[in-house]
């Protein structure tokens, strides 16, 4: 099977280094590539290791004012634009600076209603969630974890890059015909990130198209079920919420800001006012509650079917500490975020998206599976998990930095676990 990149090469295109080399998937309108210079991503191979020598060695052996709410990351305990939740144990409500509206241009949330079962999350709770404990934590399981930690610590950077190179050589197992159909081309954020036909998420009785993929990861007979999707476009917002409703998803993990480095990564697809729902043909979406922590935003939505009045609750969790380039400097915030998302998950596949729905989304899914595996005293293999992802959505985990970050996160979790008494 051909990847979107291979299709470009067949038509005489190069590797999307410049916007002028874009393929015209939309005939009169070109889509960007997920790897263009204007999109803030690092090149696959950085400066630490010479990529050509690694490759040789491998083959010898392989539109909103968002900055008003979330300015460039500043590590300050006195930043009044973010509600610091560390003292939340002394509060019994969410912030209520202005109960009229809450959205990307406001640092606002609302008092919890008496009937609400949602409670504000404290930093203490997040710290406890990050302390992953196996079901059985005795001398035998400790020894197994120590062996696992030692094996991971022995892996050098070169070994991890070789693994990533091997993943890059995978042949796509399926076609992308639906994504290339004329009526669907405007529904893709990037021309080189399309879902496989066999794993794409169908919409409605007609199985309409959305750029989203079912991801099922199997480890020791346990299955972990996700939807990996791109950040919604203005014209696909209704499709996105329809997908959430039809798949009974109760959690959305969003791992991007709407704008990063001056580039639009995802549109604001949620209602920003507590009084004005987002109206669609068959349903509307209401914002109920809102909380801003130091590193992610919690929004509680209700999707209400107009025909029946039946309501479906969704918790929207937006991670805001991923830098414009590369990966987070510290794994701590992301570990807490992933654990809170997992704790919040109840029904349907866990829906995850970034901008393209492959890079940060892949990192999230990989480490979430590893965390669940550790809890159940099972062994795990990061490369195997990523291989399974890539068989179901093209290009999951885009860069070697993201792949290395998976290892760094798991190492930190294991070290913290073994340090416990």
UniProtKB/Swiss-Prot annotation:
The protein's role, per its UniProt record: Tyrosine-protein phosphatase targeted to sites of actin polymerization in response of varied extracellular stimuli. Has tyrosine phosphatase activity towards various tyrosyl phosphorylated substrates.
Protein family per UniProt: Belongs to the protein-tyrosine phosphatase family. Non-receptor class subfamily.
Name of this protein: Tyrosine-protein phosphatase non-receptor type 20
Biased composition (Polar residues): 48-58, 104-116
Gene: Ptpn20
Region listing for Disordered, in residue ranges: 1-58, 93-116
Provenance organism: Rattus norvegicus (Rat)
Domain Tyrosine-protein phosphatase, first and last residues per copy: 160-413
Active site: 354
Top EC class for this record: hydrolase
EC number annotated for this UniProt entry: 3.1.3.48
